[in-house]
């Protein structure tokens, strides 16, 4: 499946949901916000949101600092 992730074309072999994508990237699902095809996806829906060929995904990872 081909998607665009943060502006870069990617080919996915295994990730089928947003949760699986986040895990495959080594990110903490509690510390990211995801936009799919210009729509913000609620964190509670990551596991139920299936990826589709051609999806445009933007992931923002929150980090602490001061």
Per-range role (PLM):
Residues 1-7:
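Eukaryote-biased recognition of intrinsically disordered, low-complexity regulatory segments
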Residues 16-25:
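Short amphipathic, charge-patterned alpha-helical segments
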Residues 7-16:
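Short, contiguous acidic and Ser/Thr-rich linear segments
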Residues 41-46:
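Short alpha-helix capping/helix-loop boundary micro-motifs
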